[in-house]
UniProtKB/Swiss-Prot annotation:
Keyword Glycoprotein in record: yes
Region (Disordered): 515-542
Annotated organism of origin: Pongo abelii (Sumatran orangutan)
Residues where Phosphoserine is found: S4
The protein's name in its UniProt record: Organic anion transporter 3
Keyword Transmembrane: yes
GO biological process assignments: monoatomic ion transport; prostaglandin transport; response to toxic substance
Localisation: Basolateral cell membrane
Amino acid sequence: MTFSEILDRVGSMGRFQFLHVAILGLPILNMANHNLLQIFTAATPVHHCRPPPNASTGPWVLPMGPNGKPERCLRFVHPPNASLPNETQRATEPCLDGWVYNSTKDSIVTEWDLVCNSNKLKEMAQSIFMAGILIGGLVLGDLSDRFGRRPILTCSYLLLAASGSGAAFSPTFPIYMVFRFLCGFGISGITLSTVILNVEWVPTRMRAIMSTALGYCYTFGQFILPGLAYAIPQWRWLQLTVSIPFFIFFLSSWWTPESIRWLVLSGKSSKALKILRRVAAFNGKKEEGERLSLEELKLNLQKEIALAKAKYTASDLFRIPMLRRMTFCLSLAWFATGFAYYSLAMGVEEFGVNLYILQIIFGGVDVPAKFITILSLSYLGRHTTQAAALLLAGGAILALTFVPLDLQTVRTVLAVFGKGCLPSSFSCLFLYTSELYPTVIRQTGMGVSNLWTRVGSMLSPLVKITGEVQPFIPNIIYGITALLGGSAAFFLPETLNQPLPETIEDLENWSLRAKKPKQEPEVEKASQRIPLQPHGPGLGSS
């Protein structure tokens, strides 16, 4: 008897599964608000130097830029030198008395004057948040293996709720960055546990649908944020509004059951059996649940227990040439996807279009993009889909370099197209990486690969600072990186309709078969298929 058959006995798609997926999905819906929050809480309005006390606000105080508007970071020295009759010859100085902001909405930029020489701090805040996700993945992944999925999920909900609320009351910018780091740390724990707990409790035939539903929760969450930001103009209240729900999720998570596989592998089979019987009773199959025994449960997971005893580390990813090449190519693709995604997702205000409408469009393009990706993965294959997604995204980003700023419509269309390609890349990478790595080292391979997408996400905001040297430099860097990531996919083997490798030896045999003349394809067993799982930047770990 397999675990899927045990799941069928207790109810594989009963009331429990639907409630379970809903409880896991609602936090993902709200998690998108935190990932993209700085689009609105760190918006930079039009601004100019505050005039000196007792000075008139006119051209004698504020020098005009090439566009006929006041310079944002300079003002004339006051009082003026009477010996210089031409105002263009007057000396200028930085904004010594602060700035005047042309906006009714406040943000961390207007509160702490993160403009001109301090504008780098705005990008630093987003990178600090991404660093929290990166460090959280490294720390909480190990803790999840030691203490279980549910405790990490529960603590992560509480951490995100508390640190998000703390950020709303931050008295200074450094304290705000500390809380944002902790927010990212909590998000990483939520992602890690949610993906595992979602997949385990649904049957194989329904995993694609349920994983699709979970993936779309993040997509639809992107529609909520613009509405909240429009209705709540104060950044502190907006920060608090998106954080409070996680206190509720913290309470509801106590209903979420622990991973059965983790319990059995940790020597807690009796507790696993109690949970299975509780699920059976909830699904109206109490008698079937009572018939289950510890012997059946252990026998079912015997293979997984044996695999768990085989210890593999990240160094094993570089032990054989094929595995080493795969790791390099996948890491580059993951890095490029996270790097390019956040260049567009967090650069909404750069296109000169209504911030709220464009964010809704950016979220909406994910819906058809993920659907097209599923079709492409099924019919064109993995490495073709992966290469196309990143190459098209890179091409769109590079094209932005050559489109004048006044052609806002063209620039917006290119940005939306590129944004749609990048979630497709995430979706493909999640499936592709799972299929390429052998079972005995799959979790390690996924962890290393996902580490690189977090590094890319963390570095992405910092690259925008190079725009101060030349405005086109950031898009050149983003675009070329995406093209390199797409090209790396051509060096990866195709996995469509191929059996999953269980051990490193299986992978070596797969490599030897690939060098032989092409024969009839091996029929893939249904039990070996990994479902297509739409993936997003907030669902980056498993």
